[in-house]
């Protein structure tokens, strides 16, 4: 809302005050607009675990700060010791958040093979947030296939 304060003039050297003119009320109108930005992206958790039964692993990206405007962030998977194309399908893209949207899921296909995998991992990384937006930790998360 609008902010007001009183301004008083006193001790004028070499000048005179007009009667009833030495005090004024100043009003600052709240007319600011929200900039495109002013928030951050991060993963909800730094690690996720998924069974090697096929299907998808889901990781959650959260948007913090102002959600009044649309914003976007890019993502991609990277191999740690799980093999892309054998254990999981590499994915990349851009998540587009609508106004007032604070979370989105990334689905990563997990591939079932004939080898019993235990503890194989890959990462999902966030990059390139919209102008004015930042990345918060964790901006990289590890998915472990058990």
Descriptions of predicted regions:
Residues 1-146:
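Short boundary segments that mark the start of a structured unit
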